[in-house]
Amino acid sequence: MKKVLIINLRRLGDVYSSAHLINSIAAQGATQISVLVYQESAKAAKSLQNISEVFTINRQEIITLKSNKIFSDVDAFSELFTQMNEIKNQTWDQVINYSNDTVGTYLASYIQNSTGAISGVYYDSQHLTSINNKWTLLFNDILTAMPLAPVHFVDCYHKIASTPYSFVGEKIITSPPHNEIARTQIQTIRIAHETEGITAKVVGIQLKTSSALKDLPSELVKDFIFLMKKSSELIPVILIAPNEYERSCANMISEHFDDGVVVIESDLVTLPSVLSNLDLLVTPDTATKHVANLTGTAVLEISLGTSPFLKQGPYAQNSLILTDTLETRSFAGAHPTSITGMDVVSTVLYFFTATKTIKPLLSPNVTLYAARFDQLGIYYYPVSGSVNPKVEISRLMNRQIVSVLFQSSEIECIYADIKDQGKNIVSKWADKERSNITQFMRDLLATLRALLQGQNRKDNSLEFVTSLGRLLNYANSNELTQVPCLLFKGKLELIRGTTVEENTRDVEVLLHELKSNVLKILVLLKKLDETAAEVRTGNAVTKTAEVNI
């Protein structure tokens, strides 16, 4: 039986999100899967299906030893190694560095002699970064550098682990007694609100997140709960964790409605049972969202602040995301939102309509995205609200570029999605990108020429460095050359030649590869032009209508 260890020293939401990969690995058959997490995440890890063993690191104990002056640093390291002994003394067929951070990379490197293969980043014997999978480069060097990431983390993790996604299988463990209690209580709430034979939908509202930057503003919550309570079709219930802070927040909102809002309190063990019985979860970016994805509960994420929904949004076919327009999102800090209570309720009612032909009318600078799947996995497409066509075209074409460069295939539905923006807009955008590529190719050829001349003339080295720096600036651009340039930059940092000649040869190879990759973009732009020429109407996304409450 194959033995797999997943190192996941990330946050609680990432532990739950890893269940997608764990389920896919288990679907391959005859595999024993273990995970390494921080001790505070052990309860979440133990709730995941298909886990044989959960190993933990007590980081608080290690931090105490490291920070207390009466102990030597050696004591902290000794404690860490003691906690790692059971893992190191086993043989693993595959170790997956799910963390892809410094600590996870060190630990993956520490046990590399105990495994036949490491998926993800690790350090070699000379303490140099090693990457044995091009998708790891995508994860670490491209997705992290692009605010509008073209690929979801879940899909990238599957590629890193060389595992196809499996849509079949249970991902989280639930307790039958807890399931029955939750079903009975929530059904009682439904019956109590039933009028004229209409069975109302129970909508769970998650209040708090791990960061105040992502929390739903209390006034926004009050506004959309007020509107929900006016509708005979909706029953809002507040979801909280069992702690005094969240209780006080929930009580404040409930008191605003004369205690007329149901509050459901659940811990990590009972949360899956509660979510399984809801008709919809309205939530900011939380671990609760990831649990809902595992239970099959529909999710409407209200994405605010630092929430990176394009790469860590809800992972399910029926997911919706309500956000301020992408060009107004900073993803780096707090920002006032244009989302209103009416936007939320209109979107909720849209979710429960069968045909989805009438789109909700949203406030200015607010966009509603829906989840779709293609050959790369999940992505989000605007279905209503304010849309910047150039931003959407660039975002989708970057996804197309990733597909071509990393898996040598085009995604036909992306061309169809871009067609919705209108022929003239697409044509002008493509012309501008071709102009950008022309300038990029000039800089690339200048860099290549300086490199070759530098082999014969040492005084040309400064010219090469200057040209290379100019070329690498494209890695910070918002142009289509960004993805291939980031890929080039990532590979450049991995060059390990021992002589100037070896390094020069490797750089030359990478420059020619970069040139080839950019030429592929020109082919994609030509295909886009041909597809856009078939468009007869303008932007279908703006065809919206108001949903009455």
Feature-to-residue mapping (PLM):
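Catalytic machinery of carbohydrate-active enzymes
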Residues: M1-I549
